[in-house]
Amino acid sequence: MGHREDLLTGAKRCLEEKGWSRTTARDIVAASGANLASIGYHYGSKDALMREALFASMSDWADDVQRSFEADEPAGGGRDAELRERFETRWTRVLELFDKHQGVWRSQLEAILQVRHDPELRAAFGRAQPEGRQGLVGMLHGVDESEVDEETSRVMGSFYMTLVSGMIVQMAIDPDLMPSAHDLVEAMRRILGEAPETSETSATPEAPAAPEVPAS
């Protein structure tokens, strides 16, 4: 790798280990084996390098999630049951990889808190939003993100991004209190007015008994 790639790799490592706010230019130099002058030469500034490293790290998480998904879709149960099962299965994997990449997500949260005072960082997050929404729909629906239309990206992608944002905050406070994928599905069921799921309602219903034939 050249110095540019080394710097990006080093900055990503610093985001994971030290976080957004605590990473210094010297930390990046130490992690990359490059030199201070090369940061300005290749990226213009340490802040620009950090922005690129943050979004590259989030892209790495998305790639990791995508690789972890099983190719097979849930079979049987009708379309609604399929959607619920697929969401629960895939969101469970998302949560598992949240934990694996939690250093990056903590860094993202730190960065978000800085956007009010950093117009360039704010603009970078703004540019990433449409692509992020589209990518989340593609991952969780099991389709190529190029097939996700604008309306679906706006409605469903925004919903998924809201879930992700909430998970980032919850993880920062207390990871043990994060709701499971099943909890989220159950919450959505109740919001839509469905009865709470119990062991009886979640079980496969028994076939009705045959009607009695009246005696002749």
Locations of the language-model features?
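Hydrophobic alpha-helical connector segments
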Residues: E52, Q66-V104, M156-Y160
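Helix-turn-helix
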Residues: D6, G10-E52
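Helix-loop "lid/cap" segments that line or gate small-molecule binding pockets
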Residues: T92-D99, R106-H117, I191
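Hydrophobic alpha-helical bundle segments that form small-molecule/ligand-binding pockets
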Residues: E73-A81, V115-A123, P130-G157, M171, ...
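Actinobacteria-biased recognition of intrinsically disordered, low-complexity terminal regions
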Residues: T198-S216
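Amphipathic alpha-helical packing segments from all-alpha helical-bundle domains
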Residues: A62, R67, D99-L109, P119-D144, ...
